[in-house]
Amino acid sequence: MNPNQKIMTIGSICMVIGMISLVLQIGNMISIWASHSIQKMNQHQTEPCNQSIITYENNTWVNQTYVNISNTNFLTEKVVASIALSGNSSLCPISGWAVYSKDNGIRIGSKGDVFVIREPFISCSHLECRTFFLTQGSLLNDKHSNGTVKDRSPYRTLMSCPVGEAPSPYNSRFESVAWSASACHDGTSWLTIGISGPDNGAVAVLKYNGIITDTIKSWRNSILRTQESECACVNGSCFTVMTDGPSNGQASYKIFKIEKGKVVKSVELNAPNYHYEECSCYPDAGEITCVCRDNWHGSNRPWVSFDQNLEYQIGYICSGVFGDNPRPNDGTGSCDPVLPNGAYGVKGFSFKYGDGVWIGRTKSTNSRSGFEMIWDPNGWTGTDSNFSLKQDIVAMTDWSGYSGSFVQHPEMSGLDCIRPCLWVEPIR
């Protein structure tokens, strides 16, 4: 075969290959066109379906050929029971306290991703209990954790996670931008209250089921703040206490009644010479009792109780077993502020049982260390320092911090009474 014949043979072979390639490309285009036509026809067809369908479509270019990938996932609907938490039962009688959970966040944070937090608290619906907390917008052992000691900064947010779990970015739910907060569940949805903004113009943002439903503007323009523990719900209405004014003098205090995330009523307390901060509130027999912090001049704790119409009573726990920190040694109490060592304070709580009271307090009189529960059978109204029960919760050698109350409703516990519970913040 001479060179010319070789060239002609090679050319013929190339031409045949090219024609075959062209036919294949035409067939590919026809196939894609037919596929799109079938998809478009199917999109106009409607069929009844009892399941939720989510279709994800990813469009990808490969070798200049349009490929359509369609994945269909079938999701069964999760029905969440809704029930009004009545709050009409009385507190369960108790003779002691048992440990419910501990998150060990500081220890886990030495290796894991754990938020820098303060002001944690617990609140329960009829289905679950969650830990709420104020982050500093940083993780433990991270460069952004330096200097996270401010109570109020634009980086602080209210978040929540299942109770007993260390608060991390992987299990936590954003609730609100906040440096002061509260949250509670009315049996239908979570209500969250997050306060943020400048000291002279802070705003409380109310969310119900994650949606902003109302706001409360600072009325004294002096660091509006709230409970740092759960609000209290009765018959579908939730109640909270807020403070606006000096932390070392007479301030203004208001009770708010909230329904489905909207303020329906508020009352300003007529409370001269009283100081209410960071109240711990709970329902009891259809009414609300709040035990608070006096940061001005009392080493015993002030209280306010009110009904669902916001008719209220005020006072101080009379017991000579003092509940604040710093505080003097136990002695003779008063139903007015006990002045020795009365300045400053720490968030705390108590549970009232008739004339008796369970008092939670630090074991130390001058530092936030240790924690104990004391039963004073006439301490709500009596001024002596006699008590009948004492139970250690945190050893004197360990740090404590804020503490507060929360409850489990009969709709959750199955009891015929409201179970009183407490939490303690281990500051490090």
Curated annotation (Swiss-Prot):
UniProt organism field: Influenza A virus (strain A/Chicken/Hong Kong/YU562/2001 H5N1 genotype B)
Family per record: Belongs to the glycosyl hydrolase 34 family.
Region Involved in apical transport and lipid raft association, annotated ranges: 11-33
Keyword annotations of the record: Calcium, Disulfide bond, Glycoprotein, Glycosidase, Host cell membrane, Host membrane, Hydrolase, Membrane, Metal-binding, Signal-anchor, Transmembrane, Transmembrane helix, Virion
Protein name per its UniProtKB record: Neuraminidase
Function description: Catalyzes the removal of terminal sialic acid residues from viral and cellular glycoconjugates. Cleaves off the terminal sialic acids on the glycosylated HA during virus budding to facilitate virus release. Additionally helps virus spread through the circulation by further removing sialic acids from the cell surface. These cleavages prevent self-aggregation and ensure the efficient spread of the progeny virus from cell to cell. Otherwise, infection would be limited to one round of replication.
Xref: InterPro entries: Glyco_hydro_34 (IPR001860), Sialidase_sf (IPR036278)
Post-translational note: N-glycosylated.
Residue numbers on the Intravirion membrane side: 1-6
Enzyme class: hydrolase
Membrane-spanning segments: 7-27
Additional notes on this entry: The influenza A genome consist of 8 RNA segments. Genetic variation of hemagglutinin and/or neuraminidase genes results in the emergence of new influenza strains. The mechanism of variation can be the result of point mutations or the result of genetic reassortment between segments of two different strains.
Annotated binding of Ca(2+), by residue: 294, 298, 324
GO cellular component: host cell plasma membrane; membrane; virion membrane
Catalytic residues as annotated in Swiss-Prot or TrEMBL: 151 (proton donor/acceptor), 402 (nucleophile)
One MF term in the entry's GO annotations: metal ion binding
Entry domain remark: Intact N-terminus is essential for virion morphogenesis. Possesses two apical sorting signals, one in the ectodomain, which is likely to be a glycan, and the other in the transmembrane domain. The transmembrane domain also plays a role in lipid raft association.
Major place of residence: virion
Region Hypervariable stalk region, annotated ranges: 36-90
Cofactor: Ca(2+)
Residues bearing carbohydrate: 50, 58, 63, 68, 88, 146, 235, 386
Activity regulation description: Inhibited by the neuraminidase inhibitors zanamivir (Relenza) and oseltamivir (Tamiflu). These drugs interfere with the release of progeny virus from infected cells and are effective against all influenza strains. Resistance to neuraminidase inhibitors is quite rare.
